[in-house]
A protein has these predicted regions:
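A hydrophobic alpha-helical transmembrane-helix feature that marks the membrane cores
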Residues: 2-228
Length: 228
């Protein structure tokens, strides 16, 4: 009689076939579509929260200017915001409490920024300087984000470069405290602009390609790039 029983390794063969993209193209298309929908949702939530935090920062900066907070408040607010961003936000980013934390961080940074803007407003061409800085920052962010969104390129390779660059900038800033060289200050400012531009490309690319799935942490990264 013929042996009509199934081979013992039939289940393993079926599993291999199920993982074969040629045998099950619809499964891979479905997974790709799910990833795209998830990335688009994170991207939408990120930009909505980013817009809200920027508006809140602007409001707090206005309050800071109105009450004329001293310039040393900038350092205090940045230190407190950094501590919250490093130790508090990662622990709350997966809950609704994370939204409150991100608003607290951006509000503090807005207060500190307002104390610096107060000094610039006292200069002869202070308002023009501030308008140019804000306008340039907005154009750079929109341009780089638009490029990352339309090109859909993977800019994850910039991660190591940005980290190394930030270490160099921090060392240069510490050295310039003692050297007080105007040329070095200008070079540091230019380097920070380039590094923050790379950060915008890196963070936006991670959201698009599914590398960042938490919109609160994504908002925090993009906000810091704009703030700096």
């Amino acid at each position: 009689f013929c042996n009509l029983s199934y081979p013992k390794n039939r289940n393993s063969l079926l599993q291999q076939e199920s993982l074969d993209p040629m045998a099950n193209p619809n499964m891979y298309i479905s997974r790709g579509a799910e990833r795209a929908v998830s990335s688009n949702k994170v991207l939408k939530n990120t930009y909505m929260l980013l817009s809200a935090t920027l508006a809140f920062s602007a409001l707090m900066a206005g309050v800071s200017i109105a009450v004329a907070l001293p310039s040393w408040m900038y350092l205090v607010s940045v230190i407190v915001a950094m501590v919250m961003g490093i130790f508090v936000l990662p622990r709350t980013a997966n809950s609704s409490a994370g939204i409150g934390v991100i608003f607290a961080i951006t509000g503090l940074l807005g207060l500190g920024l307002g104390s610096i803007l107060t000094m610039y407003l006292a200069l002869p061409k202070g308002p023009e300087i501030i308008a140019t800085a804000f306008g340039g920052t907005g154009l750079i962010f929109l341009g780089l984000s638009g490029y990352a969104l339309t090109s859909k390129r993977d800019f994850s390779f910039l991660g190591g470069f940005v980290f190394a660059g930030m270490m160099v900038v921090v060392i240069a800033m510490l050295a310039n405290i003692f050297l007080a060289m105007p040329a070095l200050s200008l070079a540091i400012s230019g380097a920070i602009i380039l590094l923050m531009s790379a950060f915008i490309l890196f963070d936006t690319s991670r959201i698009i390609n599914g590398g960042e799935t938490n919109y609160i942490m994504a908002t925090y990264g993009l906000y810091l790039s704009i703030f700096n």
